[in-house]
Amino acid sequence: MSKVPALLKWIGNKQRFAETIISYMPEQFNNYYEPFLGSGAVMAQLLYQNSTTSTPRFTHSYASDILPFLIDIFNIVKYEPQQIKNYYSKEIEDYYKDPNNKYNEIRDRFNSNHN
């Protein structure tokens, strides 16, 4: 089975173990609840597997995390992917126009809020 690449690098990421974790789940169930979303590795792998089979394992999935910004990131990916594409297209375009200035801008932004 293909592994889904991680959207985020995250401490405690379960990407390496996602398929093993999933192997302990029942063959079919109604709802999947992910209480500690983090990078979303297990959920992403499970959703991928569910979408590539003729007999889906589950019908609904729900994710939560104590960090609201993680949920915000995943909601943007799910509901507004064009917004992400536009943002990074502009960032890349600005970088190619003036690499030193863009590097300094990104570095300063990171150093001021660490994300």
Question: What are the functions of these language-model segments?
Answer:
Residues 1-37, 41-42, 49:
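S-adenosyl-L-methionine
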Residues 41-45, 70-73:
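Short catalytic/ligand-binding loop motif for oxyanion handling, primarily in non-cytosolic enzymes
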Residues 18, 31, 44, 61-64, ...:
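Functionally constrained cores in energy, signaling, and assembly domains
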Residues 50-115:
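Class I S-adenosyl-L-methionine-dependent methyltransferase module
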